[in-house]
């Protein structure tokens, strides 16, 4: 089976072609970072309009690079949610329209299921079951995964997600958009300076996350300290360590609760070097293994949507012709594949 994947949930237009026998044949991505940089964050209306401009040329490019004709496709997968509703509808409209015009089955894919399954695109792919840490700009969650669609959300963010906390803290430090990667780069030049940053919600039972208080603590620290480059780097390091430690503590708890020894980390924050190193140490200490996608598939992309959609189309799942987007969509409501 060969599937065209379309991702437009936020500010990246991602298109890919995936074949269940040959693997990933092509993927094309357009990032809107420069478009939104002047505003310090994603402007939903601008994001939607840019998807409209870029999506068709990218589809043509992906099909050409995959040496794939319309007749070679067996289905179309597009991101149905969660995400920005205007951006979602661009991908949904194009995906459903092409499916109708080409007489192909189509399916709307859950964006976070795409991230969760992104490590399956690698040669060293995890086997079920495992615990997944999904960390992005909009989500932070721990999920018990026993198969595709067999998900139990063990904990999630009650306010700011980890990626959102990175971006907001970067803005407090005067760093340009996108702030998360820039903060991590600044933190790499920092040194331990005795800051006592909290590890939110680790002093109580449970697996939920909260990062809004940590952001406020950082803001107060910035205001009280000298405004020089090294001090900012030291604060950035302390903040990053606090976020990573918090995620690691919660992962240990989730692994102990489930008894699993495989951990998947995915989503934009999974590209963070300190997070990867820390979780690798955690898994080594318990005789387990950590899995994550390559850097280009940590952020939003069409490859993960094509892969996830192919699994569901191959299992016989189909949707009607209605164009639908779901800005909010609980992961654990997805039907399982047996």
From Swiss-Prot:
GO MF term (any one): N(6)-L-threonylcarbamoyladenine synthase activity
Q: What class of enzyme is it?
A: transferase
Q: Which residues bind Fe cation?
A: 111, 115, 300
Q: Where in the cell is it found?
A: Cytoplasm
Q: Give the matching PROSITE patterns.
A: GLYCOPROTEASE (PS01016)
Give the UniProt keywords, A-Z: Acyltransferase, Cytoplasm, Iron, Metal-binding, Transferase, tRNA processing
The chemistry this enzyme catalyses reads:
L-threonylcarbamoyladenylate + adenosine(37) in tRNA = N(6)-L-threonylcarbamoyladenosine(37) in tRNA + AMP + H(+)
* GO annotation, cellular component aspect: cytoplasm
Return the cofactor note field. Binds 1 Fe(2+) ion per subunit.
User: Could you say which protein family the record assigns here?
Assistant: Belongs to the KAE1 / TsaD family.
Its annotated function is as follows: Required for the formation of a threonylcarbamoyl group on adenosine at position 37 (t(6)A37) in tRNAs that read codons beginning with adenine. Is involved in the transfer of the threonylcarbamoyl moiety of threonylcarbamoyl-AMP (TC-AMP) to the N6 group of A37, together with TsaE and TsaB. TsaD likely plays a direct catalytic role in this reaction.
What protein name is recorded for this chain? Answer: tRNA N6-adenosine threonylcarbamoyltransferase
What is the protein's species of origin? Answer: Shewanella putrefaciens (strain CN-32 / ATCC BAA-453)
